[in-house]
Amino acid sequence: MFKKKLKKYHKTIKAKIQTIVLSLGKKMLDKPTALNAAPINLQMPDSILFLRQDGKIGDYIVSSFAFREIKKNNPNIKIGVVCTNKNSGLFKENLFIDHIHLVKEKSISSYYLTGKKIAKQYEVVIDPTVFVRNRDLVLLRMIAAEYNIGYLKSDYSIYNVNIDNPELHFAEVYQEILKKCGLIDINSNYEIPEDSDSNENISYFLEANRLAHYIAVNFFGASRSRKFTKENIIKYLQYFQDTWPNKQIVLLTYPAVTDLL
């Protein structure tokens, strides 16, 4: 009981400190740069940078059409992506992306150095995330793009183009952003990333285990809120077996959780 109260108290204090730090950072960093303080006259740009350092595979798939559609409208446009080494594999395989710029997760100095390295190389920066951290503001200020396009960022000065509708699906957010960049006739069909080695390994696994009619389950999403406890995993597996007794179950895993599964 005491441990639970202490844990709850620790979370409360941590949340308050984070709020104070973010508030101070916003006051110091959330200012229009010399370029994006100019009047808005955004047409089809010659270079676009996507901020995807927090990108998950699901977000990548539903937004993957954006890179293809930009190149379809202008094959000569330069497309860059800021991401971490953790999710860079998703973007490196995309033929429509010209440059990958890596940042170290949660390292404000890395964000600063990467932003400084690519300063003024992109006309438009696209940030589809809702939550803004101080390191994100540092990155934007160092990049100093003419247009910073954000989603639900009306209370931030550094974003001079904003998508306001909170009801949009993630793919629809990207469609609206592309429209802001002058694109029309947008095809939002997804681009599914493929890896020949992975395809071969999966095919071998399915064949070796004689799997044909099965249920694939991922108990470990990228967010902490989407991770299941051992007890709940057992409950769900029992439910699946009771509900679909003739189905085989395949558990999706990665090294850190394989022993648990």
Regions found by a protein language model. Give the residues of each.
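Catalytic machinery of carbohydrate-active enzymes
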Residues: M1-L261
